[in-house]
Amino acid sequence: MAIQSKYTNTQVEALISELLAVLAKHQAPTDLSLMVLGNCVTHLLENKVPSESRQAVAEQFAKALVKSVK
């Protein structure tokens, strides 16, 4: 989603591949997959982002997500 990233494409693609493999292993339908991934995002925001930054980070993430599907 990011235009520039401090992470390599290899790092990003490896994580994507592993996450999708887990969803496939569990034969998770699209709605369940999106729900689980959304809950993961919420978990990361609540546990890894300082409370004073959460709203802004969540909004940036949401904007990037919308932009990525246009």
UniProtKB/Swiss-Prot annotation:
<dbReference type="InterPro" id="IPR009857">
    <property type="entry name" value="UPF0352"/>
</dbReference>
<dbReference type="Pfam" id="PF07208">
    <property type="entry name" value="DUF1414"/>
</dbReference>
<protein>
    <recommendedName>
        <fullName>UPF0352 protein Sden_2336</fullName>
    </recommendedName>
</protein>
<comment type="similarity">
    <text>Belongs to the UPF0352 family.</text>
</comment>
<dbReference type="InterPro" id="IPR023202">
    <property type="entry name" value="YejL_sf"/>
</dbReference>
